[in-house]
Amino acid sequence: MKEKLTHAESLTISSMLFGLFFGAGNLIFPAYLGEASGANLWISLLGFLITGVGLPLLAIASLGMTRSEGLLDLSGRVSHKYSYFFTCLLYLTIGPFFAIPRSFTVPFETGISALLPSGMAKSTGLFIFSLIFFAIMLFFSLRPGQIMDWIGKFLTPAFLLFFFFIMIMALLHPLGNYHAVKPVGEYASAPLISGVLAGYNTMDALAGLAFGIIVISSIRTFGVTKPEKVASATLKTGVLTCLLMAVIYAITALVGAQSRTALGLAANGGEALSQIARHYFPGLGAVIFALMIFVACLKTAIGLITACSETFAEMFPKTLSYNMWAIIFSLLAFGIANVGLTTIISFSLPVLMLLYPLAISLILLALTSKLFDFKQVDYQIMTAVTFLCALGDFFKALPAGMQVKAVTGLYGHVLPLYQDGLGWLVPVTVIFAILAIKGVISKKRA
């Protein structure tokens, strides 16, 4: 039995975790942030890093510090029934109902579709591409014991190779001086807050909770099994992963900001990166960009299928095996990607807006539980208040035809920051402060 991971083992797990986290969306957000921020780049980026890197790190830390086996174990601090409800809803929403189907379509829309033969229908191209993507994803997912090697040693280095191939050229031969670029929209009037909201909207804290089960099992694979040592290793790999994410975010945002003087403001970050790649590598750039996005999405999809399947096999041990769950989730994602992704996303987004505040409040309680001596009833009070407030964000994110104006109007009138999608923040902060003060007083009396 080992006491700790070697440096090489820590790097391998960190590389794997980075690969699981870092999908195409993690490139698209900072690229657009850079373009839109211009001269306000660094203050916008600071805000982005606070939530886009800080929240995922806290999610991983909450699993490590509480020595939890995964999300099911951590959310059990609220109640047994709630842990099943929250875990199922989170994994299904960020897995087969949302993020995995998007992993099929994003590389196709942003990179592969431009390489299709002339005359081929887009729907046909998507079907063929998603079939190939499905086969590769399922092949790796059915071998969960090798996920650390596949993602940590091969797919993540491949992604970084494509990424730095483009970015080094862009940094050595910048397209312009970002100091001369005028910020646009909210990045001109409130760059820090805009960056915070952009980082918040990556919703990577959910991924941090979801991928915890893979990190913990990988650490144990290397022979570290004592709970306190697993916790320490989890924290270490989380810090290394988030440092790498911060570096990649900073480079992407900087290159995006520099590109605007020559290429103009793109409609989104995917288009911006595609333009940058084609500028520096005419002809070849589209292929390099397509490969980079493909690998970025593939490794995240593999991680999500693995995490979802391991969790459901653990929650329902007498129903289906891990392999059967992996096949079912993969088929479901394949079908949604080709048939009804737009509809599914329109319903998944409101659920994500409900889940994210619940996840953040759980993380906050878990991290400070020992400090303030939180009991189960405190978890339940905090969760109930968060749920009631987050329902407002849920209703606001519903498709236009389903919104109840009386409800959203009431929430907008009562909750500060509601229009920013943060209506839960003030009341939950107040409740947390009250529970913390109560905990301190109780500890002094004990």
Curated annotation (Swiss-Prot):
Description of activity control: Leucine uptake is inhibited by the proton ionophore carbonyl cyanide m-chlorophenylhydrazone (CCCP).
Residues that span the membrane, as ranges: 13-33, 41-61, 81-101, 120-140, 154-174, 196-216, 237-257, 285-305, 325-345, 347-367, 381-401, 421-441
GO cellular-component term (any): plasma membrane
Disulphide bridges: none
Keywords: Amino-acid transport, Cell membrane, Membrane, Transmembrane, Transmembrane helix, Transport
Superkingdom of origin: Bacteria
Name of this chain's protein: Branched-chain amino acid permease BrnQ
Entry function: Branched chain amino acid transport system which is involved in the uptake of leucine, valine and isoleucine. The proton motive force is probably the driving force for transport.
Matches recorded under InterPro entries: Brnchd-chn_aa_trnsp_Livcs (IPR004685)
Membrane topology of this protein: Multi-pass membrane protein
Presence of the UniProt keyword Transmembrane in the record: yes
Cellular compartment(s): Cell membrane
Species: Lactobacillus delbrueckii subsp. lactis
Molecular-function annotations in GO: L-isoleucine transmembrane transporter activity; L-leucine transmembrane transporter activity; L-valine transmembrane transporter activity
PANTHER family registered for this protein in UniProt: BRANCHED-CHAIN AMINO ACID PERMEASE BRNQ, BRANCHED-CHAIN AMINO ACID TRANSPORT SYSTEM 2 CARRIER PROTEIN
